[in-house]
Amino acid sequence: MIIYYSANQSKSGLKILLKNEPCLILENQFVKPGKGQPFNRIKIKKLISGKIFTKIFKSNEKLIYADVLDVKVKSLYKDKKYWNFIKKENFEQFKISKKNLGEKYKWIIEQLECIVTFWDENPINITLPRFVDIKVCNANFDIKGDTIKSGNKYIILTTGAIIKAPIFIRSEEIVRVDTNLGEYVSRIK
């Protein structure tokens, strides 16, 4: 069953189909010019690619509701190309490829609780917690050409990510990382 909304009815947080791709409405601004028809200027985020753009719709134009589902999951383990997850509600297991996870692949650890967005029963997006605690596997290496010594150094995490951290961080310690910025936040004791 297809559900339609007029551009006037759309609110931020509503998920719609645009050019056969699920999108999230971030902002909806109604504009009534002095001359001409009123319209809606809608800020939209594509759920698959993550691109954000603004599109103008006539006020009476119909938008198609996107049947997407956000599911709480827990990461289990990774193999060469995939991360394996389990749905918390029914314990069904599924995989997401490293390619589909993109940069978020670097911040996933075992037993991490996150939210996966499904469309047509396929995972299209993953929302990680803002902060993740990850073990440092190597804190004793330098990047060639980095001759300026400051209060920071590069460290390698068990996930394979390389980040800057203070010089007092040692191997085998656990650090808190901001998954949105990809930066060191603090040391966990």
From Swiss-Prot:
Pathway: Protein biosynthesis; polypeptide chain elongation. The modification N6-(3,6-diaminohexanoyl)-5-hydroxylysine is found at K35. It holds the Pfam family EFP_N. GO terms for cellular component: cytoplasm. Keywords: Cytoplasm, Elongation factor, Hydroxylation, Protein biosynthesis. Its main location: cytoplasm. Gene3D superfamilies: 2.30.30.30, Nucleic acid-binding proteins (2.40.50.140). CDD domains: S1_EF-P_repeat_1 (cd04470), S1_EF-P_repeat_2 (cd05794). One of its GO terms (biological process) is peptide biosynthetic process. It is found in: Cytoplasm. The keyword Heme does not apply. One of its GO terms (molecular function) is translation elongation factor activity. SMART domains: EFP, Elong-fact-P_C. May be beta-lysylated on the epsilon-amino group of Lys-35 by the combined action of EpmA and EpmB, and then hydroxylated on the C5 position of the same residue by EpmC (if this protein is present). Lysylation is critical for the stimulatory effect of EF-P on peptide-bond formation. The lysylation moiety may extend toward the peptidyltransferase center and stabilize the terminal 3-CCA end of the tRNA. Hydroxylation of the C5 position on Lys-35 may allow additional potential stabilizing hydrogen-bond interactions with the P-tRNA. Involved in peptide bond synthesis. Alleviates ribosome stalling that occurs when 3 or more consecutive Pro residues or the sequence PPG is present in a protein, possibly by augmenting the peptidyl transferase activity of the ribosome. Modification of Lys-35 is required for alleviation. HAMAP family: EF_P (MF_00141). Belongs to the elongation factor P family. This is Elongation factor P.
